[in-house]
Amino acid sequence: MEIYRKSAAETFTQLEATEKGLTTSEVTKRQEKYGFNELKNKKKDPLWKLFLETFKDPMVIVLVIAALVQLVLGEVVESLIIFLVLIVNSIISVVQTRKAESSLDALREMSAPVAKVIRDGSKQSIHARELVPGDVVILDAGDFVPADGRLFESGSLKIDEGMLTGESEAVEKYIDTIPDEVGLGDRVNMVFSGSLVVYGRGMFVVTGTASETEIGKIAGLLETAEAKQTPLQRKLESFSKKLGLGILALCVLIFAVEAGRVLLGDNSADMATAILNAFMFAVAVAVAAIPEALSSIVTIVLAVGTNKMAKQHAIIRKLPAVETLGSTSVICTDKTGTLTQNKMTVVDYYLPDGTKENFPESPENWSEGERRLIHIAVLCNDSNINSEGKELGDPTEVALIAFSNKNNQDYNEIREKFIREGEIPFDSDRKLMSTLHTFNENKAMLTKGGPDVMFARCSYVFLDGEEKPMTEEILAKLKETNEEFSNQALRVLAYGYKRMPADTTELKLEDEQDIVLVGLTAMIDPPREAVYASIEESKKAGIRTVMITGDHKTTAQAIGRDIGLMDADDIALTGQELDAMPEEELDKKLEHIAVYARVSPENKIRIVKAWQKKGKITAMTGDGVNDAPALKQADIGVAMGSGTDVAKDSAAMILTDDNFVSIVDAVGVGRTVFDNIKKSIAYLFAGNLGAIIAILFALVLDWINPFTALQLLFINLVNDSLPAIALGMEKAEPDVMKRKPRDINEGIFAGGTMRAVISRGVLIGIAVIISQYIGMQISPEMSVAMAFTTLILARTLQTFAARSNVQTAFGAGFFSNKYVIGAVLLCFVLYGITVLPGAREIFSIPASFGLHEWSIAAGLALAAVVMMEIIKVVQNKFFK
């Protein structure tokens, strides 16, 4: 049986402890048994292991093999270039992994550093890490709870448990036994490590420390929550495997054909040299086919996306998250602080004369009823706003003094004018608070509390400027108004006063009778203003928004309906209802559950997994410790900037303005980034395909290999990188936020990308073949030089065609992407370097290669690109 279902006495018996605390010797024994009250460090992998892990990627393995082959053949420069690219990518990956491991460190820092305990029969202050089960701990306002425990004393104790439960209001604590099984947020006789005491005092016996606390359990969930691959990572990994196998098979075939020619041909030739040439042909195909710079370019394009998102108030911690967010189909969002402002606010009020809603902004225009309502709300109140603007006290009471300030009445002026002379503190049993003040030499008790309790104690009502007897009609109207407010999920408080004898110096419980009712206030943690539009925008983008909160079901439903998150056929579930629901039933109802209330961290992970099981890319937003495991489990975790360090460190993205709108904006950027990555990939593979076609054509016709390995590496690693990165800077397509989310099984060459790769690759290949043929009429060396020049120019000019699969270069705005213009010009400069004296020999360009040959190569390259644009126009007009 759970501790909260046992009495305090039973708990002490189970723990073999008493209210007088443990003895020093008993503490020593228990520390040996339970250890210290701190979260254990999970052993981190050494840097060398993380570094080697990055070389498991199939594309990386293929590149390593290619580099080793180059090294064996004595091509040291080519080999070193490939290895350098791989090492840089690995270092970036290791740095990102190390940053992601900081979640548990933040959790450890949340533990209270000092605890007030009773040991050996006396009060002591100790380090919180020294606590053991059975210790008796004293709590006062402002204290962090140092361990989990069962309360046995409570004096108006209120604790903010929002970091664990997501609850927006402080929880009133009791010591009574709870007979039924309830969720974490309803265990009001328990306290939890890391939560904050905002009001009152109490004493509890420690029932759990370290990993046995609720925070400790969350730490365990963080360790077991799976880190998901992004859709792009999954697609590139799958494609890399297929590409590697395909290239291997092609290379073996090429080598077999060439070797067969040698063995079946003229044996008088130098067989060893011929076999080596055959092997070099195969290596050239491997180098031409593998886009060596692909990994680096994808990383850079994603980084460009992070900069764009930063301007939209979204900071990316993990680069692949940019692309993942763009493919998101479900956003599981916390309510408090995400959809709402995380600040209780008075939104309505009611006076017995019927006045409500619009409170006069100037105190001079207040009615006497409004003036008295404000005075009671401010004076019968223990909260404050300090000189730094920090709000201190219960959020509900802070809302009341903020209400006064909002209506141009400084609450401090009221308190300075009417000093508190006595009080009866708030008590969770009677649900009232009363204070004593003097008004114009007349003593009065001011009282605020729950409406039902106040109605029962009010014999009079302040109406039309006079104190009148409470009638059944007036009481019925008050109850009706209270019900209206409650149905809107508003928190209602009632206010009243009672005239006291002039010699009154202190208040007694029996004084809280025959009160004069003044009015009601209604408050709520209101939705963020921009949330309404962002929810609608997400619907247009085909994204399902689901609210997951620790708050009450009624409140969550009201907010959900208000902001348009819940449709007519949608339902809400509590954490307990979810726990009782079998997987099959959840699977059937999942798409109609818009709100989950009173949920636990385990519930959140289950919800995320349920959506992922349906193949949906799922984002999870949150700001509390309770959100951290689900943030890690989700395909992309989105933490609020004002949230806990634990949430931020578990997330892939952080919103600096805590604005839900920023998520929708970031989705648009993410979709654009993925579009641009596909453009870059198509650009790279079209160029590579053109090179392979030329090589295979030369092989079939027994021509000389049109390229050297160094030429291909120069194009793949240096020349192609600049335009590919520039394509990552393209602006969003007009329909980017009107499309449905991408199918996660959709390949990276879907949506016309493969068609573009093939058509552009074939045109580049044809241009190179023609150029090589023309060069062969002069010399074998000239054929290589012309093939290389045509390939590099065609691939460079292809950048303009690659900007869009729909629009031509002029349709998209020829100069609208200045990075493309700059990249193309720089590529021409880089090519110019290869024909300079000294460099010609390195790149196998003969001295006789001049302007005439260059003009032929350039003309063929330009013709290929013009044909690409013509094909694009024809396809879009007749085959759309």
Swiss-Prot record:
Keywords attached to this entry: ATP-binding, Calcium, Calcium transport, Cell membrane, Ion transport, Membrane, Metal-binding, Nucleotide-binding, Phosphoprotein, Translocase, Transmembrane, Transmembrane helix, Transport
Residues holding Ca(2+): V287, A288, I290, E292, N716, D720
Top-rank lineage group of the source organism: Bacteria
UniProt keyword annotation of Ion transport present: yes
Alphabetized GO MF terms: ATP binding; ATP hydrolysis activity; metal ion binding; P-type calcium transporter activity; P-type ion transporter activity
GO biological process terms, semicolon-separated: monoatomic ion transmembrane transport
Reaction catalyzed: Ca(2+)(in) + ATP + H2O = Ca(2+)(out) + ADP + phosphate + H(+)
Gene Ontology CC entries for this record: membrane; plasma membrane
Regulation affecting activity: Phosphorylation is inhibited by EGTA and vanadate. ATPase activity is stimulated by Sr(2+). Inhibited by very high concentrations of cyclopiazonic acid (CPA).
Parts forming coiled coils: none
Phenotype when changing R795Q: Displays optimal activity near pH 8.5
UniProt family annotation: Belongs to the cation transport ATPase (P-type) (TC 3.A.3) family. Type IIA subfamily.
Protein name: Calcium-transporting ATPase lmo0841
The organism of origin for this protein: Listeria monocytogenes serovar 1/2a (strain ATCC BAA-679 / EGD-e)
